[in-house]
Amino acid sequence: MLFRSTADQGEKVMKNLVFNNNGARALGECALVPDPSPISQSGITFFNTLFDENASNHLAIGAAYATSVEGGADMTEEELKAAGLNRSDVHVDFMIGSNQMNIDGIHHDGSRVPIFRNGDWVI
């Protein structure tokens, strides 16, 4: 749950988005996209989320995609909520990836499993 937000630019817009839209304070998506993806390697920022989100790891606040759970496309809003999907009128992606990003999975016993190294899949 997002409780505070700051920004070097556009902070007022960000706060309005987060605190004035139901469900916008919760995570809606977490996507791992390898840096060597074709969109990333093009070096172009398209200023179109549907393209740009395929260039980088990203997190989204707001609505989760119904299709991220089996049968989700046929579920009611109540069923989606019961399945744990965040519901909101907004879904905003924030790109966070780079060719220097390392990501580990952590087991219950604390041991780590490398997932991403230098912006690319290990497993």
Q: Where are the language model's segments positioned?
A:
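Short, glycine-/Ser/Thr-/acidic-enriched flexible segments
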Residues: A7-G10, D35-P38, A64-A66, H108-S111, ...
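A short, structural micro-pattern
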Residues: A24-A26, F51-E53, G97-N99, D109
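Extended hydrophobic packing segments that form well-structured cores
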Residues: E78-I123
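C-terminal hydrophobic structural anchor segments
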Residues: A26-V92
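A short, polar/charged loop-to-alpha-helix boundary motif
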Residues: E11-N21
